[in-house]
């Protein structure tokens, strides 16, 4: 009978992820623009990895559709407004992680981003909105996994 040798497999240490959850309310301004910081910047040195980003959102008032974008914001830059009239929806477009349209009549919205992002200290992720109805209010819950690398 042949001998079978059991191979030893080496597995490195896995990163320990922390699941963060936040909730809040945001409102659009008189022009219909609004937004919030979903993953806040930190002063801790080192790189953070953010993945499995999920946002649940419901509109508190009746109105029309909503344009949204989930945007990576590097340190030293500011969040721009959405351009829904013509051209690219968000500039610079290489920072857009996910985008779409929210139909109010369809019920609550759930945004899931399959993109994981490495964040340096000072970097953040923001949710940018544009509503055709000004002064609209939204409730949201954000959930994501983060680790320090």
Predicted feature locations:
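Short, solvent-exposed secondary-structure capping/transition elements
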Residues: 61-66, 79-80, 137-139
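N-terminal leader/pro-regions and domain N-caps
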Residues: 1-33
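Extended, solvent-exposed segments with strong compositional bias
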Residues: 17, 77-119, 138
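Beta-rich globular "head" domains
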Residues: 33-74, 143
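C-terminal interaction-tip segments
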Residues: 11-16, 118-149
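Tight coil/turn sites that cap or link beta-strands
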Residues: 31-34, 122-124
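Extended hydrophobic/Leu-rich segments
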Residues: 26, 55, 73, 79-84, ...
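Short low-polarity hydrophobic stretches
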Residues: 1, 53-55, 125
């Amino acid at each position: 009978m042949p001998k079978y040798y059991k191979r030893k497999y080496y597995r490195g240490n896995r990163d320990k992820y922390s699941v963060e959850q936040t909730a809040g309310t945001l409102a659009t301004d008189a022009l219909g623009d609004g937004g919030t910081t979903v993953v806040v910047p930190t002063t801790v040195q080192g790189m953070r990895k953010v993945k499995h980003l999920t946002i649940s959102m419901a509109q508190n008032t009746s109105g029309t559709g909503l344009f949204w974008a989930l945007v990576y914001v590097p340190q030293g830059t500011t969040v721009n407004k959405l351009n829904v009239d013509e051209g690219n929806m968000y500039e610079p477009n290489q920072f857009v992680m996910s985008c779409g349209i929210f139909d109010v009549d369809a019920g609550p919205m759930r945004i899931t981003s399959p993109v994981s992002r490495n964040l340096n200290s000072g970097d953040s992720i923001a949710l940018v909105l544009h509503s055709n109805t000004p002064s609209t209010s939204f409730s949201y819950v954000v959930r994501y996994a983060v680790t320090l690398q």
